[in-house]
C-alpha cells in the first residue's frame, strides 16, 4: 500500500509551498535567473559607461584643440598688430 511514489507525493502535499521553496531545484533556478539578469544589467551599465567615456574623451580633445587655437590666434594677432600700427604712425 505504501509505494515510494505515494510516499513522496504525500510528503510534498503535507509540506506545501514551504517545502517547494526549500528544494534546491527552485533555489538553483531562481539564482540562475537572477545571475543572468544581473549579468545583463552589468553589461548594459558597462556599455553605457564606455559610451560616455568615449564621448567625453572625444569632446575633451576637441575642446583642448579649440582653446589652443584661440589662444594662438589672440597672442599672435595682438603683438603683431600693435607693433605694426605703432611703426606706421
From Swiss-Prot:
Q: How is it modified after translation?
A: Phosphorylation at Ser-56 favors interaction with CALM1.
Could you tell me which species this protein originates from? Bos taurus (Bovine)
* Primary subcellular site in the record, as a coarse category: cytoplasm
Give the protein's recorded name: cAMP-regulated phosphoprotein 21
Q: Does the keyword Isomerase apply?
A: no
| Localization in the cell | Cytoplasm
Which residue ranges does the record annotate as region Disordered? 1-89
PTM Phosphoserine: list the residues.
33, 56
Q: Which UniProt keywords apply?
A: Acetylation, Calmodulin-binding, Cytoplasm, Phosphoprotein
Q: Which residues carry this modification: N-acetylserine?
A: 2
Entry function: May act as a competitive inhibitor of calmodulin-dependent enzymes such as calcineurin in neurons.
Q: Give GO MF terms, alphabetically.
A: calmodulin binding
**A GO cellular component annotation in the UniProt record:** cytoplasm
From the broadest rank down, the organism's phylogenetic lineage runs: Eukaryota, Metazoa, Chordata, Craniata, Vertebrata
Q: What is the annotated quaternary arrangement, including any partners?
A: Interacts with CALM1.
Amino acid at each position: 500500500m505504501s509505494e515510494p511514489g505515494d510516499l513522496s507525493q504525500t510528503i510534498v502535499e503535507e509540506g506545501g509551498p514551504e517545502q517547494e521553496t526549500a528544494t534546491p531545484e527552485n533555489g538553483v533556478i531562481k539564482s540562475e535567473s537572477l545571475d543572468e539578469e544581473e549579468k545583463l544589467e552589468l553589461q548594459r551599465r558597462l556599455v553605457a559607461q564606455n559610451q560616455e567615456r568615449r564621448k567625453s574623451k572625444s569632446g575633451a580633445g576637441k575642446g583642448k584643440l579649440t582653446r589652443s587655437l584661440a589662444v594662438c590666434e589672440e597672442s599672435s594677432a595682438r603683438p603683431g598688430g600693435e607693433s605694426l600700427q605703432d611703426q606706421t604712425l
